[in-house]
Amino acid sequence: MSTPGSSRSIPFKSKKRLVMDSPSSKSQTGNPNPSSVALPTPEKPLENMLSRSRNRSVALSVKEIRQAAGSRRRSEDPVASSAKSRLFFDSSSSSPSKRKSSNKNAEKEKLPEKYENLGKFFEALDNSMLLSKLRGSKPTFSNISKQIEHLTERRFCYSHLAQIKHILPEAIEIKRVLIHDETTCCMKPDLHVTLNADAVEYNDKSKSESKKIALRKVFRARLADFVKAHPQGDEVPEEPLPEPFNRRKPVENSNVEVKRVSSLMEEMASIPASKLFSSPITSTPVKTTSSLAKPTSSQINIAPTPTKPTSTPAKQTLSEINILPTPVKPVSTLAKFPSTPAIIDSTPVITATPPEFASTPARLMSTSLAARPLKRSNGHTNPDDISADPPTKLVRRSLSLNFDSYPEDERTMDFTDDIPIDQVPEEDVSSDDEILSILPDKLRHAIKEQERKAIEDQNPAISLAKRRRKMIACLPKLFNVIHYLIQSIRRWVITKEELVHKIIAGHSDITDRKEVEEQLILLQEIVPEWMSEKKSSSGDVLVCINKLASPLTIRSRLEEENKQEMAPLLS
């Protein structure tokens, strides 16, 4: 009974000894077979058991794992939080200073809108110049203006380029060039713009920067200086551009000149008329009756001279008129009319302006000449013989606005038979023949010939004939140009646009496109067997040249036509 119990207890105890590994169990056991205790079982090797014993401290419950994780977080968080707080503090402490400095710089560099737009135009100009250089295209105004408008979303004109050149004249170089226009197949003028960054003097600080950035800073600094010098917001002046692009604005001082002229006119209007004109003339009342009795001798007193006042002043004058400074001579007599008013007839009569106050030169001359024959009266003069009728008795004639007539004709106009007229002195009369008689014969004939040619040029038929002769005289030269051109390109059919373009581009003395087209029409008219025109399906006009025609024959034909046109002039 004991043996089986002991045998059963041995394996149990051996397990505990192996697991616990305590020395008390070794002293208590009295098993004579130690091999069963010392050797481990093959299912559970010793290394695995030792590793399990080492890992037993790690294998904890879920609660302990959570506590261990929490302790680790608490141990790690202060370091990270302190680092993060330091970084945040540094960034928060540095950002206000940076913001303040950036705000100050922005405030310093802030300009009014129109000056700011000019600065943007300059930056876009610099960028467009760089782009055109990378693309290999010429920096002409037509090329860079499109890029500037795309970058700034504003229209870039010649005036903006002139303003930029005024701010930075030494760095911007502008010259006139001729470029080929693909639409018109002609050469047209354009502006070639270049930026010379080496021509500008920089500060010591800006030498370390690139030339492009330094040039922009210099432009902006000069623009700011201009704004400070003109606080009222004046426009930036425009530098003159090469012709025909020099389209300057009207003079800004024109308004000042207009104001000055208007103020002068106001001053002239404020001056009394008595100071401006020294000879006021009193007007006589206009007759309103169909017939008026002649005044008696007691009613009329003739003054001896206009400067010498009469014994008694005039009793009644209807109005005083100050006449503008014209060559009218004052009347040498002054009449006194009684205070009794004239008898007004019941029939209405239209009153007319006195002829002596008309502004026509003929009228003024007539009244001045009519005023001459009146002489001072003496005691033997009969008052009834003196005509005291107002000037309305003169015949009213229609005033002509044609001033082309000679002064001799004007002197004979608008006089009545009842008023004697003094003859004008002969020394006042001057004619063209008398003036020309002083000149030499050759010069006189040359002047008359020029006058005759000027009259002929006014005739459209004569001017057209002269132009035709001039065109025909140039046809032999044009024939040689076209003949050599066709021989060089080896083409007998060419568009008219291309032909005209090649003629103008190859010869600097030929510049008028219209003149070349007229000469081509004359060539087709005179030598139709050599040149003709056809219209293609696309709508272009084709010029066809007959290669079988002899050049000598055509050239002689053109010279003969030229001689026929010049024959009437030689004869």
Swiss-Prot record:
Keywords: Cell cycle, Chloroplast, DNA replication, Phosphoprotein, Plastid, Transit peptide
GO molecular function: cyclin-dependent protein serine/threonine kinase activity; DNA binding; DNA polymerase binding; protein kinase binding
GO cellular component: chloroplast; nucleus
Induction, per UniProt: Repressed by abscisic acid (ABA) and ABAP1. Degraded by the proteasome.
BP-aspect Gene Ontology terms: chloroplast organization; chromosome organization; DNA replication; DNA replication preinitiation complex assembly; gametophyte development; regulation of DNA-templated DNA replication initiation
PTM section of the record: Phosphorylated by cyclin D- and cyclin A-containing CDKA-1, and thus targeted to proteasome-mediated proteolysis.
Compositional bias annotation for Low complexity: 81-96, 303-315
Region (Disordered): 1-110, 288-315
InterPro entries linked to this entry: Cdt1, Cdt1_C, Cdt1_C_WH_dom_sf, CDT1_Gemini-bd-like, WH_DNA-bd_sf
Tissue and organ expression note: Expressed in proliferating (e.g. shoot and root apical meristems, organ primordia) and endoreplicating cells (e.g. guard cells and stomatal lineage, developing trichomes).
Family the UniProt entry places it in: Belongs to the Cdt1 family.
Function: Member of the pre-replication complex. Component of the plastid division machinery. Promotes polyloidization and regulates endoreduplication. Involved in the coordination of cell and plastid division.
Name of this chain's protein: CDT1-like protein a, chloroplastic
